Structures are given as structure tokens and as C-alpha cells.
Amino acid sequence: MEIELYKSRSYSGCIKSAYILFSTNLTTIFKRTWLSILVYSIPLAIMIDLSLSSRALNEADLPIPTTTLVLMSGMCIWSLAGCIWFIAVVNRILNTRTLKANLIRATVLILILLHVAGFVKIILQLVNTLVVSTFLSAKVSSGAATLTSTVIEILLDSAFFVALLPCTFSIIKYLIDPQSKISDIFGKAYRHGWRHWGFLFITLFITGIIFCLIATVLFAPFGIIVEAQISDLLGMLNGDPSGIPSNFYILLYGTTLLTSFIFAYLVIWSSFVFYYAYGSIETTEREREKSLTA
């Protein structure tokens, strides 16, 4: 595929270029990605199906069987491996490097993201615990403590969003540019992304709106089936007999698998948007460096 990456574009230009790249090469993209998406989607669908169908996973007073825990853990590892393969395959389409090189970078990226997610979760949990314990020791009402804790959590979430948004540039650069290093994700490339925070935000905002509109339509059948399953579980908790047919879970699994499979291509399109955003920012930064050294 011929791709003109390093060119100054507006956010609308990035979205348009991503759509053109995706639509004109859909057959090639499908041939190169379908297997990795299937490998990722199968365990994901099993986990969702199991989490919705197992009473042990939905009732706090029921012990979770060891076999269920082992199966869920195995599916999680399988899905994570499929996700890494999927990222590597998509990046190989864009950077034409070997699959091995892209697998290494995708694995490193996933490990970094897991650590960042864990760090953010720990910080939020610590702050929430500190706020609640402080208010309880001050004999403030539980309602006021909950409200304050919620407000602080929203503020912290917003702060993390602001701080991590430039990573949408530095991560793409790490995956695409063979000269980029791991340290650049929160180093030089991160600083470049920070200088273009507004551009990244508006690109993310508009892309997110389009993404959510399409995803809403895509997930409608899945949502209807899940709602039926949840209603049945609630009825069973109240002592009512199950009212779903015997083949319901086959339908649930098939719908989940198909939805997650198609959803992956929506993710590919959105990644193309930030691929072009990366190219635009990189072009601007190169021109900036030339003007400073001239």
C-alpha cells in the first residue's frame, strides 16, 4: 500500500486520509488481519459468555469454582496474546517491518500499558481510601464523603487524561519508527506530543464521536441479548425459573464473537487516524527543527 505519511494535515484531513486508506485497501487489510482478530476474539467471547452465564461470577455469596478461575485466566492470557499479535499485524501493514520486530514492540507496549493502568488504578484507590477514611474520622456524613470522593476521582481521571493524551503520539511513533526507543514514550516523543496537545485532543474528540456512533449500531444486537440474559439472572435471584431457551448461550457466544470481530476493524480505522496524526505532527516538528537550526 502506498502511504503518504509525512505531510501536514488538519484533524479532518487525518480522519479523511484514514478512511481512504482503510476503504481502498479493505481486502488487503482483511486478508492480513482476519486470523489474528479471530484468535483474539474467540477467548474474549468465551470470557464474556462465561461471565454472563455463570451464577458464581454474578453472586457475591457463591464461591467461584477453581475450574472457572483457571478457564477465565487461560482465556485472558490467550486473548492478550491475540491482542499482541493483532497490534503487530496492523503495524506491519503500516511500517512494512518484519512480524518478529513488530511482535517485540507490541509486547513491550502492552506490558507498559498494563503497568501504567495498574499505577493509575492504585493511585485512584489510595486517594479514594484516604478521602473516605479522613471524612469518616471527622464524622462527616457518608453521603458527603461519597460525593467528595467522586469529585476527587473525576478530577484525578481528568488529570491522568490530560497527562497521558500526548502518549497517543509517542506510542504510534514507537510502533512505527524503528529508531524510536522505549524511553521516548515518556521522553522526547512525549514532549513533542505535548506541544500538539490541542491537535491530538480535537482529533481524539471527533474520532471518538464517529467511533461511538458506529459502535452503538454495531453493539445493538449484543446489547439486546445481554439485557435479556441479565433480566433472566435477576429473575433467578428472586427465585423465578430460567426463561431463556437452551440454545441461548450459543446465540450469545456467536453474537459476541461476530461483534468483537467486526469491532476490531473499527479499531483499525481509528488507529489509522492517529497514524496520520503522528505523520502530521512529525512533519511539523521536523520543519520546526529546520527553522531553529537555519
Regions found by a protein language model. Give the residues of each.
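Short capping loops/turns at secondary-structure boundaries
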Residues: 83, 105, 109, 160-164
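Nonpolar helix-loop interface/hinge motif
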Residues: 1-56, 156-235
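Membrane-helix interface segments in multi-pass membrane proteins
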Residues: 41-79, 121-160, 215-264
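Interfacial transmembrane-helix boundary/kink motif in multi-pass membrane proteins
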Residues: 17, 96-116, 187-192, 201
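Juxtamembrane transition segments at transmembrane-helix termini in multipass membrane proteins
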Residues: 5, 60-66, 85-99, 163-180, ...
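Central hydrophobic cores of alpha-helical transmembrane segments in multi-pass inner-membrane proteins
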Residues: 12, 79-89
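Hydrophobic alpha-helical transmembrane segments
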Residues: 15, 30-31, 73, 107-111, ...
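Hydrophobic alpha-helical transmembrane segments of integral membrane proteins
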Residues: 70-74, 78, 108-129, 195-210, ...
